[in-house]
Every structure is written in C-alpha cells, then in structure tokens.
Amino acid sequence: MKILYAASEATPFAKSGGLADVAGSLPKALVKDGVDARVIMPLYGDLKFRDKLEYVTNYSVPVGWRSQYCGLFKAEVNGVTYYFLDNEYYFKRRGLYGFYDDGERFAFFSRAVLETLFYIDFTPDIINCNDWQTALVPVYLNLYYRHLDKFNRIKTIFTIHNIAYQGKYGTEILEDTCGIGRRDQHIVEYDGCANFMKGAIETADKITTVSPTYAQEILDPWFSYGLDALLREKQYKLCGILNGIDMEANNPATDPHIAFNYDVNNFEEGKAKCKEALQDKFGLNKDGSPVFAMVSRMVGMKGFDLVQSVADGLVDRGIELVILGSGESQYENFFSDLCGRHPGRVGTYIGFEPALSQEIYAGADAFIMPSKSEPCGLAQMVACRYGTPPIIRETGGLRDSIHDCTLGEGNGFTFAGYSAHELYDACCRAQDRYYSKEDWNNLIRYDMECDFSWDVSAKSYEGLYNETANLW
C-alpha cells in the first residue's frame, strides 16, 4: 500500500496547530507497520532543517492562465520520506497562513501535489488530503488528471481536522487562479462563494474526521458552519478515526522537562515531586489542596467562559488553579486578576512555553478541558499519559477518549451540557475522589495505562485505505 499524505504543515518541519502533529506522527506509525507512506508539504521560508533538504528537480505548475515555478526537495525522517514544494513567491514568508493570497497559495500547492507525481518514482494508491489547504487536490485530480494512466487508479481521502476553516473566497478565484471553467465551478461553489472544502467533500472518495463523535456532530448545523446539508448527502462516505499522540515524546519516564521522572510503578513519588515543583514555580500554597490545570488557547470555543464563571467558586472550595495560555484579552485579563484576588491559590502564565506545559501535565492533579467544540483534542490524552485525570465536556474527541469514572470504569470526569453548573459539579466530583487516596491512585494508574498511541489509530487508517483502494 502506497500513501501520499498531503498537508500544509508537519512536525518536525513546520507547525501552527494539531495538523502538524498528525502529519508528523501518522505516517511514521504507518511506515512502522509496513505501509509506504510519504508526506508532501510546502517549503516555507522559516522551515526547520532547510539545510538538510536534498534538491530533486524543478518544473512548472499551472495556476489559472499562467504557470509558476515549483522546486522539489526531499528529506527522510524516522523512515518517512518528506517532499517539499518550493516557490518563494508563495511560501518564503514569516508564518504559514493569514495572508491575503492564501487562496492562490494553496490552489498552487494542491495542483503542484499532482504535478509532482510526474517527477518522482512513486505513484500512490491513496492521496490523503488534510483540511482546506489541500482540498483542491481531489477536485483537480478528477477534472484534469483522471484520464491519464498514471492517475486513473489513484483514490483520495479528505480529512477534516476543523470544519470551521473551509477556505472561502470570492468566485472570481475559480477561473483566474484555480483554472476551473464555468462548467465545473459548481463543484467548488457554495453559498455564493468559492469553498475549497466543499469541493473536496464533493469529489473525494472518502471523508474522514479526527474522531467518531465529530463525524456525527458535523452533520448538525450547530457544528457544521453551513456544510451540514452537504455532509448528510455524502454521509455514506464519511467516518471518524480518533487521533493518537506520540507516546515517546510524551513520556513521564523520560521527559527532560519535568522535576522527577516516573512511570506507572512509582507515580506517587514522581507526581508528588512534580506537583511541589509546579507549586514553587507559581507560588502556590502547599497545604494538601488539589491542583487543577488548563493548558489551552484562551478563547470561548475552549470553554473559558465556563471556567471564568466557576473559578472563584472552585478556589473557595479549596482547589488551586494553574492556567497556561493566551488568546482573547477578556480571558487573559480575568485570569491575571484572579491571581491577585487569590494569592497562593491561583497561578497564571499568559503565553505558551512547551516545557512549562509538560511540567503542568506532570505536576497537576487534574486537567480541565470544557470545550464547546473539540474535533479531537490531544491535551486530554497527554494528561492521561502523565497520570493527570481530565475533566472534560462530552464533545468530539473528548467524548471518544475520556469516560466518566463515577459511572464505573473510566479515566476521568465528564459532563454533557455546556453550562458552568455542570462543569462545577464535575470539578467537585474530581475533588471528592482526590481525597480518597486509594480510589485516586487507581484512577491515575488506569489513566497511565491507556493506549492512545498512533499504532492504534494507524490500524484504523490502514483498514480505511484498503477499503478505499478497492473502490471502483
């Protein structure tokens, strides 16, 4: 089985969000299992390890009525071949996204992915495209390449990581930049504009999301950002596969950033020392109170409005809070002020430091994640890996990965409704369980033994790839 994984970012080369972690981890797990999986992505100006890349060739790529240069480079990391598409006009910039011509940049990239196959000794069975930045790949394949022998058996899978970002532009981009004539523009047009994601949903052989629950949620108007009717029509080719985490990178037994390394056999000593170090760093009291933490962007979608409503009540109940993140000023200001109102009980760091986030995962007693919507979420899995039971709202991948321990065997505390009252109740249940040492230690042990590795997810993807490759 040959897989070409097309993504706009991938670790360790370029990252702005969770897509990079998936693109860096899933192909590695597939290769480990004997699949010939390769990654193709843009060669950004601030790409890491640029000096390690090997030049392959260059060629022209159609962009509407004109052609643009494309240079091809490659590298191999962890047994995975990475291809990098170079065009300084489009990609030699500071940052990955947020430019006025993003539509043109990624229309070029999508077309270049297919053109590249003429110049490498690799014809994939499946091209797995990811989010709107690669959404035109299946559109272009069906319109301009399907009749060629090299392409007529290639199948496409489109993975939706976050349906909120669809790649919407004025319809004038379709002919001038994408080169799609009026006869075919209906494939990409939606609600009066060009919608790249809509084009992929129409033309890809299969559609996946990053969790089974999210695959069901996006059929509902509340979650779909306008695409629910189309997705219900295409539901026969939609499924959800839960993402995994890198179990090697997130390992409390070897993590160099935490105060004391531990595993499932000595977590009591290890977490106690990590908690003490965390309390020292944030100036918190060491009076036996549980420490509940959040590591997140400070935006409403992550449930910060709920946390804002219950924070004072949780502190008054004897819970210490640690918050790491940045985002909307109303939340940054609130949690900064919260420290002043509750000295020794609340610690806030505005910004993001990867090493500090690992210290929090290891040192906190519980991890709060009350998202309004969460396609998959990785933080709750990392928290389990470090023996820090999550408190989550039942949505998307949170619902698929965390199950309430008060209902029997589970690895955290959950609530269903998007309300401050339900979040407060879940936190109180976690606090009550914390003071029952034997029950709490059993929960930590259960969490640390959960298998959220990419090996599990890769098996599901392999099944999907085999099913898709056998479609007529």
Predicted ranges, named:
Residues M1-W472:
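Catalytic cores of nucleotide-sugar-dependent glycosyltransferases that transfer UDP/GDP/TDP-activated
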